[in-house]
């Protein structure tokens, strides 16, 4: 299926592609969508530019790469692409690794993903929204922040659990201060959208300060002093 005139892929497009893969496969593989791909499959976003899929099992990952190469997918530097879909990059993550983050548990574990669809050979899930927010905010671009606000706005994310899991994951990061700063930015966005209340907003500040991170969520803009521009 050629979609080269489009620059974003919808959930329907992706399911069609995976169904085509499934027809040609002679092995089973578990795929867990993450990032914008998961948000698209869960109908939180309309479409995504890149296709991000976790393949938790190494043997399945190796088989899938071999299979895709046989279908003339080729590495582009950022992932795999096909001549029929040159604008779409398929990024496959092996094990518990997503973007710059190692998940604390396998995404295949119960409650760590949401079932999207099963075919004869492919099991497709979407990373649970708590872990999805963690992986996106560890990277922490503006687009990641907006996606995470949209995910939180579904009402399917427990704020207390998110704070606890994010803090635990930060302990294992090479730059914990940076990822905590990213969480502060997210908290400010959630508070602005009235998705968390003042009490929880302050709890985030207290929690981060207990970590030694002094810059908790801001209490609002400070008045400009003479000479400020």
Regions found by a protein language model. Give the residues of each.
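Compositionally biased terminal segments of proteins
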Residues: 1-229
């Amino acid at each position: 299926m050629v979609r080269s005139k489009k620059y974003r892929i919808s959930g329907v497009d992706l399911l069609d592609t995976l169904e085509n893969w499934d027809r040609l496969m002679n092995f089973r593989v578990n795929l867990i969508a993450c990032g914008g791909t998961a948000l698209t499959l869960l109908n939180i976003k309309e479409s995504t530019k890149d296709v991000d899929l976790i393949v938790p099992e190494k043997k399945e990952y190796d088989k899938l790469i071999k299979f895709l190469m046989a279908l003339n997918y080729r590495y582009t530097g950022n992932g795999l692409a096909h001549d029929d879909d040159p604008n779409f990059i398929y990024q496959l993550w092996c094990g518990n690794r997503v973007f710059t983050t190692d998940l604390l548990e396998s995404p295949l574990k119960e409650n760590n993903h949401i079932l999207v669809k099963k075919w004869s050979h492919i099991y497709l899930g979407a990373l649970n929204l708590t872990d999805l927010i963690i992986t996106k905010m560890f990277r922490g671009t503006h687009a990641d922040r907006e996606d995470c606000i949209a995910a939180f706005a579904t009402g399917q994310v427990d704020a207390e659990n998110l704070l606890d899991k994010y803090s635990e994951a930060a302990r294992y990061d090479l730059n914990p201060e940076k990822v905590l700063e990213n969480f502060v930015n997210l908290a400010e966005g959630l508070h602005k959208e009235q998705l968390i209340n003042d009490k929880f907003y302050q709890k985030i500040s207290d929690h981060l300060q207990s970590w030694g991170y002094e810059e908790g969520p801001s209490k609002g803009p400070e008045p400009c002093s003479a000479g400020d521009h």
